[in-house]
């Protein structure tokens, strides 16, 4: 499917306090590389920065319409605080239903220090079935291998920074689906 039709990308980026420092740099590098790929291929890209419950910021990049200043602003954003997976996933679904991202897949970048309640997993699976999107998890576990248990319930694929470089992760994601 990836070779026939390039899908839009919604990238959910964990900016909780536990990702401050090197993990935040890894996450931004992967997110911005996905943005560059989307732009070079004329695809829409949304970056959903998230931390605690209800705390998020969405930057939308349309093909040929985003400036360097907008990209720098996205790169400099860091929300801090706790971690909540429900908020960014709800925002991603809203973008698919109302925001012009009806043909998007989700890249979910996190250190995995959170979990999603079973009711939310069920709602997400229903939305995935209806909207036909995938969620690819990118686990920022460099130096702390593990933690994929929080992503397994809702991600179809999980890549780890402890096992692959940022470029390898992006290459795998692009080849796989996005």
Residue ranges and their predicted role:
Residues 4-5:
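Short, small-residue-biased leader/transition segments that mark boundaries at the very start
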Residues 26-41, 47:
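An active-site-proximal "capping" alpha-helix that borders the catalytic cofactor pocket
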């Amino acid at each position: 499917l990836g070779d026939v039709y390039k899908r839009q990308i919604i990238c959910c980026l964990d900016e909780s306090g536990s990702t401050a420092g090197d993990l935040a740099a890894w996450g931004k590098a992967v997110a911005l590389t996905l943005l560059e790929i989307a732009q070079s291929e004329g695809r829409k890209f949304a970056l959903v920065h998230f931390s605690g419950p209800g705390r998020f910021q969405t930057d939308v990049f349309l093909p040929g319409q985003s400036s360097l200043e907008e990209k720098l602003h996205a790169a400099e954003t860091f929300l801090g605080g706790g971690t909540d997976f429900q908020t960014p996933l709800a925002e991603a679904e809203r973008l698919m239903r109302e925001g012009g991202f009806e043909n998007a897949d989700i890249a979910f970048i996190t250190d995995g220090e959170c979990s999603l309640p079973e009711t939310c997993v069920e709602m997400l699976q229903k939305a995935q079935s209806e909207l036909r999107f995938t969620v690819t998890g990118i686990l920022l576990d460099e130096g702390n291998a593990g933690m994929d248990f929080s992503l397994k319930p809702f991600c179809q694929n999980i890549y780890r920074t402890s096992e692959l470089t940022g470029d390898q992760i992006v290459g795998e994601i692009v080849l796989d689906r996005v």
